[in-house]
């Protein structure tokens, strides 16, 4: 027996819903009027192709931008248009808008997108779930995290902007003001450096410019971060102490806190905590975003 992820558990209702669109519609009224008339697939394809050609001729082929989101995640349906896009020299983009900030921030810190195997959470003593409501959307994360709590006594920390289902299962919930996660991350690293909890051997062997990072973070203490993030300085001190005293700290970094103007920098900052603490060197430690 298994569990169906709540993200797809109701897909059958969407597929078989009586109001689901099953044929193309052409708008016959003004935008927002809700006035549409059915047309054939042949007419619809011809009209779309004609619009593409008009855009190419008037403004250049790069003004046509095939875009996908979460409606279809299958490789054939999602990426099938790439052959047309390449031949016609249409604009392209790196995956989707919703993941670009997070992916680039993670790559900036590690050089590649892959992180620690999420199954290592079962070996962790401290699990920090940051910017993702895993209890509602990621069964695998909560399975491993709760196993570590049950079998090892691991602590679970949730950092998010609201008290969601995951936060309700946390040993410590840190409620951060939206868009300010980077400041929180900087203050956590500040405390690790200040209290001699930084793993300098790891930093000097595996990271770039650790001395410059430490200098950069000196003025960014918990009081500074509290004014920006709304997280009490005392809570920042508590969390930093937990990280600094727990070698097997696993960071599960989600997409939520990266979907804002400073998203890439916020991801890079949060990811850097595991390097400052030296968590990467331990089984059950390090960071995971997506594999």
Protein language model regions, located:
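Structured helix-beta-strand junction loops
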Residues: 124, 151, 220, 245-246, ...
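A glycine-rich, hydrophobic/aromatic-adjacent loop/helix-cap motif
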Residues: 243-291
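Generic recognition of flexible, low-complexity loop/linker segments
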Residues: 52-54, 114-118, 236-241, 276, ...
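Flexible, glycine/charged-enriched surface loops at secondary-structure junctions
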Residues: 59-63, 198-203, 250, 281-288
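Short helix-capping/linker segments at secondary-structure and domain boundaries
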Residues: 92, 192-200, 262, 277-284
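N-terminal export/assembly segments and adjacent metallocofactor-ligating motifs
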Residues: 1-197, 209, 232
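An alpha-helix initiation/capping motif
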Residues: 75, 207, 211, 234-237, ...
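P-loop NTPase catalytic nucleotide-binding module
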Residues: 179, 183-249
């Amino acid at each position: 027996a298994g569990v169906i992820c709540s993200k797809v558990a109701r897909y059958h209702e969407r597929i078989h819903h009586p109001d689901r669109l099953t044929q193309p519609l052409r708008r016959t009224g003004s935008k927002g009027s809700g006035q549409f008339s059915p047309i054939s697939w042949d007419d619809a394809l011809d009209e779309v192709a004609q619009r593409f050609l008009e855009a190419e001729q008037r403004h250049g082929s790069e003004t046509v931008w095939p875009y996908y989101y979460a409606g279809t995640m299958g490789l054939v349906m999602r990426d099938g248009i790439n052959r047309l896009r390449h031949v016609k020299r249409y604009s392209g983009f790196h995956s989707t808008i919703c993941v670009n900030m997070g992916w680039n921030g993670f790559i900036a810190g590690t050089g590649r997108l892959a992180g620690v195997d999420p199954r290592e959470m079962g070996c962790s003593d401290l699990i920090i779930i940051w910017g993702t409501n895993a209890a509602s959307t990621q069964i695998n994360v909560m399975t491993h995290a709760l196993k570590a709590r049950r079998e090892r006594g691991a602590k679970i920390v949730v950092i998010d902007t609201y008290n969601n289902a995951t936060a309700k299962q946390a040993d410590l919930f840190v409620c951060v003001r939206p868009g300010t996660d980077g400041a929180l991350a900087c203050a956590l690293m500040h405390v690790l450096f200040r209290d001699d909890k930084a793993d300098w051997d790891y930093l000097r062997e595996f990271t770039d410019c650790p001395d410059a990072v430490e200098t950069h973070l000196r003025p960014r203490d918990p009081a500074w971060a509290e004014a920006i993030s709304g997280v009490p300085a005392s809570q920042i001190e508590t969390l930093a102490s937990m990280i600094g005293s727990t070698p097997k700290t696993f960071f599960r970094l989600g997409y939520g806190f990266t979907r804002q103007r400073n998203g890439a920098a916020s991801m890079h900052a949060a990811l850097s905590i595991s390097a400052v603490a030296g968590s990467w060197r331990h089984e059950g430690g390090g960071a995971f975003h997506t594999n």
